[in-house]
Regions:
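TM-lumen/periplasm interface segments of multi-pass membrane proteins
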Residues: 2-156
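Transmembrane-helix signature of polytopic, membrane-embedded enzymes
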Residues: 150-169
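Specific aromatic-rich, kink-prone transmembrane helix
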Residues: 151, 184-199
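Transmembrane helices and adjacent periplasmic/lumenal helix-loop junctions
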Residues: 205-227, 250
């Protein structure tokens, strides 16, 4: 099938075809076929609706400032407003660089720290405080979720409708804004999209950024290695890994240097574990 002609789910999957009877039955075989744009539009609408529902489900926590036992009993806990004060964002401190006496440093990798700092800069627009910080990050993470859905749909062609499965994932309701994971998820989706377009160099850059946001994308390199071995694409794989390493270093080395051995090490992201070794040896 041409990659420009989308796969119709109701014609490709018997279970989906059976379920479609509720909403009008499978598409007719003589129906006009799309090119994938409609699938991405529908996925976008579903993603926006699902994300809005996810935020609405956190209304009990938002109404009481994410305090009290209700954040657990209502399943609406989030690290984001809690860490606003505990990690120094409320005091204008920068992650990894400004030591907070008696408190742990920001425990996420460097790119996630930068992302959270952007949220801190936007917080006054949303009224300030932990709730304002949460609102700013909801906006930023919503953009990440849309990028994830659209990149997945574009990479999955001609199965563009598969993006709707991601957009409507039940896990979104409970996990979308627990912390900043959607940043790494979005970067991972863009990485796979660029790889599918046979752009290993740029794919590696985005992979490096994804690893600088969260370490789990590194785990996906194992299956990617096996696929490249099977398809004789090892040259592209090593090019991707090389640019990934450069991108990761470009993000982390400046922070390592600024958090120099002459300053007290702030425990936090495992990304900066090398700095702890430098400080202890100094």
């Amino acid at each position: 099938m041409s990659p420009n002609v989308e796969v119709e789910p109701t014609l490709d999957d018997r279970d989906i075809a059976a379920g479609s009877e509720v909403v009008g039955a499978p598409v007719g075989r003589s129906a006009r076929r799309g090119t994938g744009q409609m699938a991405l539009i529908v996925a976008t609408v579903v993603a926006l609706a699902g994300y809005a529902l996810s935020i609405f489900a956190r209304t009990p926590c938002i109404s009481n400032g994410f305090n009290g036992i209700g954040r657990y009993t209502h399943l609406c806990y989030s690290d984001i407003p809690v860490l606003y004060s505990l990690r120094g964002f409320a005091d204008g401190r920068l992650p990894y660089l400004d030591h907070i006496p008696g408190q742990q440093g920001f425990e996420y990798p460097v790119l996630t720290g930068a992302f959270a700092q952007i949220g801190a800069w936007l917080t006054p627009i949303f009224g300030g405080g932990g709730i304002g910080f949460y609102a700013a990050n909801v906006l930023l993470l919503g953009i990440c979720f849309l990028v994830t859905v659209l990149a997945t749909g574009a990479a999955a062609r001609p199965r563009n409708w598969d993006a709707v499965l991601l957009a409507s994932a039940p896990a979104l309701l409970v996990a979308a804004t627990i912390n900043w994971d959607l940043l790494a998820v979005a970067l991972t989706a863009v990485w796979l999209l660029l790889w599918s377009r046979k752009l290993p160099g740029w794919a590696g850059v985005v992979l490096g950024l994804a690893i600088a946001a969260k370490f789990y994308p590194l785990v996906l390199c194992g299956p990617m290695l096996l696929l490249c071995l099977r398809s004789a694409r090892m040259s592209a794989f090593w090019r991707m890994m090389g640019t990934a390493a450069l991108a990761w270093l470009a993000v982390n080395v400046p922070v390592m240097i600024m958090n120099s051995p002459t300053k007290p090490f702030v425990p936090g992201s495992p990304t900066l574990a090398i700095v702890a070794t430098m400080n202890s040896a100094a």
